[in-house]
């Protein structure tokens, strides 16, 4: 290969055969960046990276870009050496700081807070140049607020790294337009493939969850909703259902601070403004109790708030309380490694008075289902091929029914490395895929 033939190296350090723990490196001769540096999920039996391994992996890295703030994508951020610049969305950084400031009241999270204070931010649609690599973030719908996909350009080549995304959220309607207008055809598509291994999972739109929640609120006066405190679109569904039915949308001070960040950065103020959110006061008053007994409520709770639910149920006891379980089913009925005892105890409080997740229409995935994955491949038409990450080892893209001109770059090893230097494959072995200008 001629020495003056520029190339791009892509290394999937982790994520080809596992959901979460994603680490993807993109490098030219002069510049190296990493997309996401996440923790392994609890179900993963592999040992987590040590501080020494993280230092070795990031040695010579010019920047790390995070697609969003879920731990399986950003969890190692506090262990990254100070010499490596890290980037995340503006709203996402505020959420992270809010979370760790709250945690620091009961534990030592100084290392995390210091790392967050050093972290830089990017803006949607605004190019950032790191050496000879250009990175442009584009907003996408996910179960995390302020999530992005990245268009990466270098050496006249284009890579799209989707991060985690979906089309069935409120913000998902802009996906195809963004791909057609701002991305176009790419050389390599690096796409999440979570749902490739969940063919039977029911996928609802957030709007359907809103309608289902509204029906529950019409029938029941006191409803507790167990969900992620940072899932903006799910919380917007619950808030909208309360506004439609006249119920009060109730939360604690921490949740309200997260909602305020959503409202500050959210583009759709009517949906993401959370104007009617009611912060339950530290000291109850007869006025507050009377107000909520009269109107009824949907009370947003977290897995750590078993005590709060019991306390509120003692106060608001004139009618039975119900639980909207809006989380992954595996947290209560999965393998032991992924079950959350606090979630199971909260469910036990309500007995059979539970509107149960995906089964009953109150939860949906934060990840693209098969048709959306197919559509992204067809719109971007990757010249070299598509690599699916963030997927189980047994997942297969065969159900996408992609045309023959779209090559799925596959590898059975956890570490995949390949080079983009042309549109024509020279061949590959278990560890390396090579391409040369024809």
Predicted regions and their residues:
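His/Asp/Glu-rich metal-coordinating catalytic cores
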Residues: 2-65, 71-233, 237, 243-244, ...
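Short, acidic/turn-prone active-site loops that include or flank metal/cofactor-
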Residues: 39-40, 91-93, 165-166, 253-256, ...
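Short, charged, surface-exposed secondary-structure boundary motifs
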Residues: 44-46, 96-101, 147, 170-171, ...
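Short, charged/polar "capping" segments at the starts of alpha-helices
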Residues: 43, 94-97, 198, 233, ...
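Short connector loops at secondary-structure junctions
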Residues: 38, 194-200, 254-264, 352-369
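Hard-cation-handling environments
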Residues: 198-320, 324, 378, 389
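C-terminal regulatory/interaction regions
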Residues: 18, 244, 276-438
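Conserved beta-strand termini and adjacent loop/short-helix elements that scaffold enzyme active sites
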Residues: 13, 122-124, 138, 252, ...
């Amino acid at each position: 290969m001629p020495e003056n033939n520029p190339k791009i190296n892509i290394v999937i350090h982790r994520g080809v055969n596992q959901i979460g723990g994603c680490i993807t490196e993109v490098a030219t001769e002069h510049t190296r960046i990493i997309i996401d540096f996440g923790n392994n999920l609890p179900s993963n039996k592999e040992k987590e990276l040590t501080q020494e391994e993280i230092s070795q992996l990031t040695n010579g890295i010019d920047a790390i870009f995070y697609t969003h703030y879920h731990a399986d994508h950003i969890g190692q951020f506090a262990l990254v050496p100070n010499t490596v610049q890290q980037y995340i969305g503006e709203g996402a950084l505020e959420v992270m700081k809010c979370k760790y400031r709250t945690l620091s009241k009961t534990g030592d999270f100084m290392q995390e807070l210091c790392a967050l204070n050093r972290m830089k931010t990017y803006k949607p649609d605004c190019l950032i140049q790191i050496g000879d690599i250009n990175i442009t973030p584009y907003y996408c719908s996910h179960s995390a607020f302020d999530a992005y996909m990245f268009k990466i350009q270098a050496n006249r080549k284009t890579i799209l790294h989707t991060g985690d995304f979906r089309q069935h959220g409120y913000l998902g309607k802009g996906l195809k337009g963004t791909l057609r207008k701002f991305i176009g055809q790419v050389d390599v598509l690096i796409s999440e493939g979570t749902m490739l291994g969940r063919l039977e999972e029911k996928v609802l739109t957030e709007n359907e969850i809103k309608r289902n929640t509204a029906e529950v609120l019409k029938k029941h006066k006191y409803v507790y909703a167990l969900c992620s405190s940072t899932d903006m679109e799910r919380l917007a569904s619950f808030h909208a259902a309360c506004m439609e039915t006249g119920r009060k949308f109730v939360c604690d001070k921490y949740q309200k601070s997260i909602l305020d960040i959503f409202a500050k950065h959210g583009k759709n103020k009517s949906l993401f403004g959370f104007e009617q959110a009611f912060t339950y006061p530290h000291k109850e008053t007869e006025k507050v109790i009377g107000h909520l007994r009269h109107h009824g409520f949907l009370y947003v709770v977290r897995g750590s708030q078993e005590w709060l639910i019991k306390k509120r149920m003692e106060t608001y006891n004139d009618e039975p309380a119900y639980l909207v379980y809006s989380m992954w089913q595996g947290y209560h009925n999965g393998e032991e490694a992924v079950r959350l005892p606090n979630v199971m105890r909260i469910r036990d409080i309500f007995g059979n008075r539970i509107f149960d997740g995906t089964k009953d229409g109150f939860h949906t995935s934060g990840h693209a289902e098969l048709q959306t994955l197919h559509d992204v491949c067809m719109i971007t038409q990757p010249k070299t091929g598509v690599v699916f990450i963030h997927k189980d080892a047994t997942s297969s893209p065969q159900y996408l029914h992609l045309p023959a001109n779209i090559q799925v770059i596959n590898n059975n090893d956890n570490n995949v490395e390949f080079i983009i230097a042309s549109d024509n494959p020279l061949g590959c072995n278990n560890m390396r895929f090579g391409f040369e200008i024809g």
